[in-house]
């Protein structure tokens, strides 16, 4: 994984990076007739860099728009979900990424959405021509 370049290796078969397409996703074992319009949740938590994550992919116009990672190494009660955001901040720090970093290819954010009570690491890919 080279997060500073937007490259996230889910496993040997699924490597998400700038300009990753839905057509490429369809060639992986994770494709189960999803339409590429709605959010795609991978069925099982995935181990990335020795941590367990719930992984979601968002495509826009056939290209990756966002990869969302929710670390599920630890269980949090509904009222403590915001503490998961602290864990995500720590993970990004361990990877050498400053909070809410912008890159040429996109940006990485650790967010806590109070309205939906969800914490996640969002890797947003800018559309390229």
Question: What do the predicted segments below correspond to?
Answer:
Residues 1-106, 110-129:
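Short helix/turn-capping signatures at newly exposed starts of structured segments
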